[in-house]
Amino acid sequence: MNVKLTTIHTGNFKLDGGAMFGVVPKVLWNKMNPSDENNLCNWAMRCLLVEVGSRKILIDTGIGDKQSDKFFSHYYLNGDQSLDKSLAYVGLTKDDITDVILTHLHFDHVGGAVTNELTAAFSKAIYHVTETQWNHANNPNPREKASFLKENFETLQYEGVLNFVEPGEKIADIIEVLTCNGHTLGMITPLIHLPSGEKVLYGADLYPSHSHIKSNFVMAYDIQPLVTMIEKEAMNQRATEENWWIYYEHDLAHEMSKIALNEKNQFEAMNFASVDMLN
């Protein structure tokens, strides 16, 4: 079985450093993620294309372009990459995509899933998400309500292109559905099993960047930060034992790395690499 992994860049955006690192003091996180004069750090929106057999599977879709200029002005979009440009660079269009895995339905992950005309952007694709996350997004709590914009996903149900997946299920036989509940309920962190024996975990917002490997580096956005810490410790342990690669959706500088214990017996990112090396 031939499997190809390709990074799909959809542009960058800025978020408050304190929001991205929670209670961790700025003196610690600013060394790794320098902030500007407004305390904003620049973040990638890096999706992943998995080609296996006749299937072309896109994991997440970026922020899209449906919202108002005022909305986007809060996030200082930058960079010359876009979803369409990145697909075109590898000779594809949205119509070539057969599956879309939505790790969760926050706007920076699902914005590209639906067009400005509120139709499914990937007209021939099935969209995979957990039912837990779907129900959570459609009945949001006050803390997350601003991140769940129904115009980004509501039409997927009306068009009949949704597929609810369960933990442990496999998509195209190689993408294992792992779920986490600390950041938001029912978030998928897909684990890709390559024919070579290598495994790649798409970190979503459990590991938005390599700086978030440490269990106490938890975003203020997370609805259950203590749960995130527990989930991350367990994932760090398994990733180390099984020698996984971690793919970072929001890390501006690094696509992926391994996780290992350092001399202080703490988990940290090591052996940074590009996903191309796995093809």
Regions found by a protein language model. Give the residues of each.
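Active-site metal-binding loops of divalent metal-dependent hydrolases
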Residues: T10-G11, T61-G64, L105, T132-Q133, ...
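Metallo-beta-lactamase
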Residues: N78-Q81, S86-L92, D96-D108, S123-T179, ...
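Cap/insert and terminal regions of metallo-dependent hydrolase folds
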Residues: Y76-K85, L191, S196-N279
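Residue-level marker for buried hydrophobic side chains located in beta-strands
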Residues: I57-I59, I101, Y127, V200-Y202, ...
